[in-house]
Amino acid sequence: AIALSKLMIDARWVKRVLFLCDRKELRKQAANAFNQFTNEPLYVVGKSKKADRQNARIYIATYPGMMKIMDHFDVGYFDLIIADESHRSIYNVYGDLFKYFDALQIGLTATPIDMVSKTTFGLFGCEGRIPTANYSLEDAIADNNLVPYEVVTHTTEFLREGIKREKLSDAQIRELEEQGI
């Protein structure tokens, strides 16, 4: 996402980029990464000062955060929208974002192709449930970008038998009560 944004800004194909994600933690990670690899003015929706919005070239927002302020922007304000975690039910809940802005739209997901919603493929113009690009787990392992995984199953007495008050110490009971459990 960052490399594509930088490439398109440097080539003057886009002036402003909107990067959307589904959680504040991802918004923070994205802001740090964009700051590390680009020198473009950045605006983090819900975090940056409103005065910083005017000069920003890259905007980072959660889906709900952008929904709250999207009507402050003209439909042509962004030239590129990158939607992280685009496999989630974004079309049903946040589809208006993608319908409102007249911009090139890129959807990113790590979800296997057969688990992505048909409406998500349609939203990004990928008919027939065929993504524009796909990098499978198997390919990533073969290219040494990921290591093979092994599923390890563990269990605990609590998972097998449940929590029984009579087996807990007074300190454990107090701790659970303080946690609202």
Language-model region placement:
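SF2 helicase catalytic motif II
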Residues: 73-107, 111-112
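Inter-Walker segment of RecA-like/P-loop motor cores
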Residues: 34-72
